[in-house]
């Protein structure tokens, strides 16, 4: 049989050297082929996008005056004032308490549910598995509005409980209340990490335990739970870092009662202040950025060390479902309570609130049904514009982000570019950049861009697409990367034997094989950018508000009905898009 990888006749190579392929028959530009141009263009674009918000933030933190004033000198005084005058130390402790409690509650919710849904024989496990993922598609801002509508001091459920028993045994406007709401929003992320690990586990370990007489609960305790250590630790750090940077729940719950965390500190000092102290703002942003970068570095280290816990080998069999006996029913109740009280009731109440003039158990809400909240949205052009802007940003941004992520993945994983590892680091770097810091940093970057380019971009949808795109890029990269790594390199080699260069190999072979993964990245990026809002707080303008920033403005004005209407519209858009995308991609092997 002829070996297709045999060195071509006349190839100038050592007898035992690497395979040599025919030189691609394409023109070069300035001494570089088109593949090299793509490599360098990719790394330059990523470097500019990632460094644009970071560099101005660091410079402002070390400057004695705002960046727009000339004659500034470098100083560390901003950091000294941050901890002595701005009471940032207390803010850091509050953030630590909030993020720590959120992480604990998230793991307590997600890990048992992953074990019960994936590894046991509870009834309705498929439905519960899908239901556990849906809170991911809803922004924590909307979830926060829903919880206040139902469980806040004047919420529907709170008012009903107070009238029935005389008191309400919970208070959302506390650190535990904030942490519980955020945990409900973040539990699907930890659940997916643990569920995927359990689905891919080798059944031989459990089979060995069964042969020595171990029962279902002993197998869970001695085999299943220890295997979850890597995903639990990794997801814990991920949840902690997301809690450190989150704005929505602390802004809605904490700010009215004086509870300040990192994100609300930036929001209050950067947006709500009449005369912002940019030095304090830059120093605080730098500290928060360093914290999130450290957490991401720890994540990467733990992910590399997780190979020591590999339990999936060749010819592994899928584990059997464990019979819990009568315990399955309390487990079902636990899951139903989470889904019902954590997501269904708050979101259902928020949707119902959008169709009523008032919403309280003290009066029959069905007697107050109205479309006035939606009429208000349709009558005011600025509200309609926010919906249109969100759709444009999400649609255009999803395409741009997915294309950039695809190119970055292929260059990082399947090229010989000497800096391909740096491309991967740059593509994943934005996961360590909180949304508010991206907004603040890009605001400063646009203000000092050369040739007045920043003034053209600032306050436009293009600026928001850049900010939101940075937030979505790591997820898109992570969605496409496994698909590229699963494609055998022999396909690349065969194309190179035929004289194709790297770029043609990518466009004619790899691009077609990873189309399903590209579709998954497109859906993920669209949903992520549709529910995003924090960078737009600093990058948007009155004409470029998105749904999230408009809901915040309406909430401050006390228009809870209009907030509910906009939230419902965003939920419907997300549900329709995800549903249609699922139908279009049905039959393709996509793991989103």
Give the ranges of each region predicted by the language model.
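The alpha-helix within a helix-turn-helix
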Residues: 209-210, 495
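Polytopic alpha-helical membrane proteins, predominantly small-molecule transporters/carriers
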Residues: 72, 92, 213-214, 387
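A short amphipathic helical element positioned immediately N-terminal to and/or at the very start
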Residues: 26-27, 74-83, 220, 369-378
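Juxtamembrane inter-helical linkers in multi-pass membrane proteins
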Residues: 71, 215, 307-323, 358-373
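Glycine-rich helix-loop "coupling/hinge" segments at transmembrane-helix boundaries
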Residues: 69, 248-275, 362-367, 533-560
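Transmembrane alpha-helical segments of polytopic membrane transport and secretion proteins
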Residues: 1-44, 299-337, 418, 582-592
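Membrane-water interface segments at the C-terminal ends of transmembrane alpha-helices
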Residues: 34-67, 80-199, 227-248, 252-254, ...
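Short glycine/proline-centered loop/turn elements that form peptide/ligand docking sites
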Residues: 201-205, 487-491
């Amino acid at each position: 049989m002829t070996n297709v990888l045999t060195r071509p006749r006349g190839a100038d190579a050592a007898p035992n050297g690497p395979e040599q392929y025919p030189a691609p028959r394409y023109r070069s530009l300035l001494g570089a082929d088109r593949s090299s141009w793509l490599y360098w263009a990719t790394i330059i674009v990523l470097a500019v996008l990632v460094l644009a918000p970071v560099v101005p933030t660091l410079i402002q933190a070390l400057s004695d005056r705002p960046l727009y004033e000339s004659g500034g000198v470098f100083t560390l005084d901003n950091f000294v004032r941050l901890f002595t005058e701005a009471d940032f130390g207390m803010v850091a402790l509050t953030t630590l308490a909030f993020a720590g409690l959120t992480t604990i509650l998230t793991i307590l919710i997600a890990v048992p549910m992953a074990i019960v849904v994936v590894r046991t024989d509870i009834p309705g496990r498929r439905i519960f598995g899908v239901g556990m993922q849906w809170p991911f598609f809803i922004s924590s801002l909307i979830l926060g509005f829903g919880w206040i509508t139902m469980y806040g001091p004047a919420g529907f459920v709170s008012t009903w409980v107070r009238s029935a028993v005389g008191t309400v045994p919970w208070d959302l406007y506390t650190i535990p209340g904030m942490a519980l709401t955020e945990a409900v929003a973040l539990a699907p992320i930890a659940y997916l990490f643990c569920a995927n690990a359990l689905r891919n586990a080798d059944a031989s370990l459990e089979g060995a335990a069964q042969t020595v007489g171990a029962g279902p609960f002993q197998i869970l305790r001695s085999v299943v739970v220890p295997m979850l250590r890597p995903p639990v630790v990794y997801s814990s750090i991920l949840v902690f870092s997301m809690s450190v940077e989150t704005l929505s729940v602390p802004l809605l719950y904490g700010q009215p009662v004086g509870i300040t965390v990192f994100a609300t500190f930036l929001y209050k000092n950067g947006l709500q202040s009449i005369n912002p102290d940019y030095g304090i703002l830059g120093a605080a942003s730098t500290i928060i950025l360093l914290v999130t970068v450290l957490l991401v570095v720890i994540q990467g280290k733990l992910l590399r060390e997780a190979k020591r816990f590999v339990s999936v080998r060749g010819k592994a069999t899928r584990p059997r479902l464990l019979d819990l006996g009568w315990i399955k029913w309390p487990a079902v109740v636990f899951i139903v309570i989470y889904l019902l009280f954590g997501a269904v009731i708050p979101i259902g109440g928020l949707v119902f609130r959008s169709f009523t003039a008032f919403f309280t158990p003290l009066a029959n809400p069905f007697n107050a049904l109205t479309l006035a909240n939606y009429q208000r949205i349709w009558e005011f052009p600025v509200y309609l514009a926010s919906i249109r802007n969100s759709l444009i940003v999400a649609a255009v941004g999803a395409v741009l982000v997915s294309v950039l992520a695809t190119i970055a993945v292929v260059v990082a994983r399947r090229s010989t570019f000497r800096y391909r590892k740096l491309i991967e680091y740059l593509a994943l770097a934005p996961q360590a950049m909180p949304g508010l810091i991206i907004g603040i940093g890009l605001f400063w970057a646009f203000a000092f861009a050369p040739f007045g380019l920043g003034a053209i971009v600032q306050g436009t949808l293009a600026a928001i697409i850049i900010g939101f795109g940075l937030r979505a890029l790591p997820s898109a990269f992570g969605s496409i990367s496994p698909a590229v790594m699963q494609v055998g390199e022999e396909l690349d080699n065969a194309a190179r034997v035929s004289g194709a260069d790297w770029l043609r190999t990518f466009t004619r072979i790899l691009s077609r094989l990873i189309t399903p993964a590209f579709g998954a990245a497109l859906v993920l990026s669209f949903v992520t950018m549709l529910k995003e809002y924090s960078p737009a707080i600093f990058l948007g303008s009155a004409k470029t508000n998105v749904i999230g920033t408009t809901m915040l403005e309406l909430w401050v004005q006390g228009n809870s009905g209009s907030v509910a209407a906009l939230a419902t519209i965003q939920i419907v858009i997300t549900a329709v898009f995800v549903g249609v995308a699922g139908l279009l991609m049905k039959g393709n092997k996509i793991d989103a």
